[in-house]
């Protein structure tokens, strides 16, 4: 009964009050893990609200973020800092940029003594650490390095055998043999099995004849082809003669080493036509070209024969029984490119967020009457733009580091389950991280106003150079479909009692949770302790993925009856893409939480917990409609999530300087006047001649 003078309480009020009491009781019984009070001193501001003042242990945070290979990164930084003539100037022409990029790569290898190719298979984490460092010098250089060592070099050592490694390793390693990776054609990119270039075996001369049958089969966008390449790994359909002289046998797409220029004179070899693809939106330090082959003959030994070979008498032999299995094995060995792009994209985001946040702390505009102007990062709108992005940068750092570790383990063990896991994870992270970074680069530019528009402050160059990350090594939309297909396969395994791969284990439990109704009591819990509980956050992410998976499986089954499997997939395509993105966000959050829990320093753990909470709640709020539609979150809880997200943005703003400093990027690496650690405006004015 309500006491006299109190308004009548509704049944909903009673229900909410009961829910809060149950929540408080459960929190007493089950303490929230990862209490982030370590290193957080509470003080009371004028309004009487608690305001957290966090003292960040910079040494510990920076050390935890560094990874194992900071030493070799510093060697890269020191080399280019000592050679200012190798720094890429603003406004450089395409021709000069290409030559400079080649000089940078040769200097790195021959002068600095850093040999990335030796780590491609032996220590992939070290290789990607070098790539991150050179990418901060010039993204074109990182891509040039990737073409030379990961694509051209990687195809030789991963698709070839000992005879190929013995013949080509040293020349690739010291850049005496600059090479190309000739897969994409004018008419076919994502559909590699649709490539039209042919490699026909001639048993009389013991040679393959490489031929471009039509304009659609011209190799297109081939890095290193326009100017510097001397060899190309050409992907072509292997065609063998049969007993019937009028017929041939198509054995599927294989890889062949094709010399394209003379080693001494550098002249284009007979039968090969090379053209320059010209100016691009970005990455103009990379010489992309187009290749046409007119019945070019190469020795039989130039077939990269790890997964299939042709004998002297034209017989085909492979340990893999079908074209599809050989094709999958071939492409599977090239997954490192996607791993590298996800990792590199996160590195680009570190540079951009560092520049934007340092400038936002420096820049002052407006303020209370008769008081000093305030930093633009003190405005809630600026915090809303940049703080969730900073949290995502940290999340991507840990998730891509884990991907690199898994990839390295896969290269050592060749464990079949791990191979499948890395393929799907690299596809999803590459697609998700590069798409997010592309949008964020524009946000950073806008957040820095007019000064963000100056080329010298790098946003334009970074945005243009990074833009293609969404397309090469697999179009992002296509890659997300691969993730969705893998999820549906795991879903089928779950209901058939099979074993799920490690990354997908959560589906077993969360699918069971999804198939029951959301708990009406927990749907109303709104305390900060509950919302910042990693279990609530991860459960919410995984519930959403399971809900999307279950519903799209039902839709596909329904539409397949009338449209067939291809038509049904296309009808549900947007749903499938949302499912894939949801799964990748779950993977990213799970790894972020694990990285926080694994941190040995209590102060740093508290700092990272704050950033992780912002990442999780911002993502939940970003898709709050989904949670509301199924009553996973009640209206009062949705409002609490929004309020807490805004507060966490404010909290992260208070340590934003320390968080970007922990990326440990020296001024000569960020190279943006507005982001200098000291005297930024002075250096900016000096740059234009004052």
Swiss-Prot record:
Keyword Electron transport attributed: no
Subcellular location as annotated: Peroxisome; Glyoxysome
Any Pfam family the entry gives: Acyl-CoA_dh_M
Names of required cofactors: FAD
Binding site for FAD: 448-453
Biological process annotations from GO: fatty acid beta-oxidation using acyl-CoA oxidase; lipid homeostasis
Summary of the function given for this chain in its UniProt record: Catalyzes the desaturation of long-chain acyl-CoAs to 2-trans-enoyl-CoAs.
Record's protein name: Acyl-coenzyme A oxidase, peroxisomal
Organism encoding this protein: Cucurbita maxima (Pumpkin)
